[in-house]
Amino acid sequence: METIVIIGAGASGLACMNELVKTNKYNIIVLEQSNKAARKILASGNGRCNVSNLNMDIKYYNHQDPLIEKLIKEFDVVNFFKQLSLKLRYEKNLVYPYSLSSLSVKKCFNEKYG
């Protein structure tokens, strides 16, 4: 089994780990410089952690990069968090953890992967 090393246990690193674990093909090691995984997740949205916006569109980005547009269209953030068993709530177009606490986002990764 090949080993993949992910540098950084922030939102992207944890999401990458989640997708790789699903394949069951790799031994995965996540390296984090600080003593806390998901440190910026905990600080995001004044501790509420807005996980997505239902009105995602390339026009809201500074660059009209085709890769970004493709990712916006193909990656379902809401479904991603539902698969991690994170309950969500909606306030207008914004998507938050139901608890309105960024700690819930971190916990959903911890509960699935330790």
Please tell me what each predicted stretch does.
Residues 60-62, 70-75:
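Glycine-rich phosphate/pyrophosphate-binding loop regions near the starts of catalytic domains
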Residues 2-30:
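N-terminal Rossmann-like FAD-binding beta1-loop-alpha1 element of flavoenzymes
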Residues 63-68, 92-93:
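Short glycine/proline- and acidic residue-enriched helix-loop micro-motifs
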Residues 30-32, 90:
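General beta-strand structural signal in soluble alpha/beta enzymes
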Residues 73-114:
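Feature captures the FAD/FMN-dependent oxidoreductase FAD-binding
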Residues 34-65:
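Conserved N-terminal glycine-rich FAD pyrophosphate-binding loop of Rossmann-like flavoproteins
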